Amino acid sequence: MSGLGRLFGRGKKEKGPTPEEAIQKLKETEKILIKKQEFLEQKIEQELQAAKKHGTKNKRAALQALRRKKRLEQQLAQTDGTLSTLEFQREAIENATTNAEVLRTMELAAQGLKKAYQDMDIDKVDELMADITEQQEVAQQISDAISRPVGFGDDVDEDELLEELEELEQEELARELLHVGDEEEEPPVALPSAPSTHLPAEPAPKADEDEAELKQLAEWVS
C-alpha cells in the first residue's frame, strides 16, 4: 500500500484519489493538526504555571508538571513535523496539477497549430505566390491596354489635315484684318441741335434812355 493509500485508508485495488481530492483531504488534515498545536501549546503553558505554583512548596507536584510539560512539547514537535510534511505534499500536488494543466494546454496548442498547417507546405506556398505574381502582371497588362488611347481614324492623310488647318487659319486672319479696317474709319461728326430756349432781349441803347429822361423832365416843368 502506498503512502497516500495508507493515509486515506484505501486498499491496493481501489482507485486512487484525484489530485483535487488529495489536496482537499490534506487541507482538512492540516486544520486538525493546527487545532492540535493550539491545544498542546495551551497545555504546555498550564503545566508550566503549575510547576511555578508548586515550586519549592511541593517539589513532587512541580516535577510531575514539568514531566507532563516535556511530553507535551515532544508531541507538539511531532505535530509540527507532520504538519510541515502535509504542507509539502499539498504544495507538491498543487504544483504538479498546475504543471499538468499547462502541459495539456501546450499539447492542445501544438495540435491546433499542426492542424492549421496540415494542408500546407513550402512548395505549395511558393506555387501560390508565383500564381499571385502572375495574376498581378496580367492585371497590370489589362489596365495598360484599357488606358491606352484607341487609334480610330489612323488612316486619315496627315497632309490633308494640315492643308485644311492652314485654310482655317487664313480665313481667321482675313476676318481679323477686316475687323481692324472697320475700326480705323472715322465715324461722322454729329452736329449739336438748335437750342429750344429763347434768348433774353438785348437792353435798349444809351441814347434812348437819355431821350426818355428829357421827355419826363419837360412834362414835369410844364
Swiss-Prot record:
GO terms for biological process: late endosome to vacuole transport via multivesicular body sorting pathway; protein transport; vesicle budding from membrane. Residues 1-150 are annotated as: Intramolecular interaction with C-terminus. It is a peripheral membrane protein. One of its GO terms (cellular component) is cytoplasmic side of plasma membrane. Residues 1-21, 177-222 are annotated as: Disordered. Residues 1-116 are annotated as: Interaction with phosphoinosides. It comes from the Eukaryota. Its main location: membrane. It is found in: Cytoplasmic vesicle membrane; Late endosome membrane. Keywords: Coiled coil, Cytoplasmic vesicle, Endosome, Lipid-binding, Membrane, Phosphoprotein, Protein transport, Transport. GO terms for molecular function: lipid binding. The keyword Cell membrane does not apply. Belongs to the SNF7 family. Probable core component of the endosomal sorting required for transport complex III (ESCRT-III). ESCRT-III components are thought to multimerize to form a flat lattice on the perimeter membrane of the endosome. Several assembly forms of ESCRT-III may exist that interact and act sequentially. Self-associates; overexpression leads to the assembly of filaments that curve and associate to create circular rings. Interacts with CHMP2A. Interacts with CHMP3; the interaction requires the release of CHMP4A autoinhibition. Interacts with CHMP4B. Interacts with CHMP4C. Interacts with CHMP6. Probable core component of the endosomal sorting required for transport complex III (ESCRT-III) which is involved in multivesicular bodies (MVBs) formation and sorting of endosomal cargo proteins into MVBs. MVBs contain intraluminal vesicles (ILVs) that are generated by invagination and scission from the limiting membrane of the endosome and mostly are delivered to lysosomes enabling degradation of membrane proteins, such as stimulated growth factor receptors, lysosomal enzymes and lipids. The MVB pathway appears to require the sequential function of ESCRT-O, -I,-II and -III complexes. This is Charged multivesicular body protein 4a. It comes from Bos taurus (Bovine).
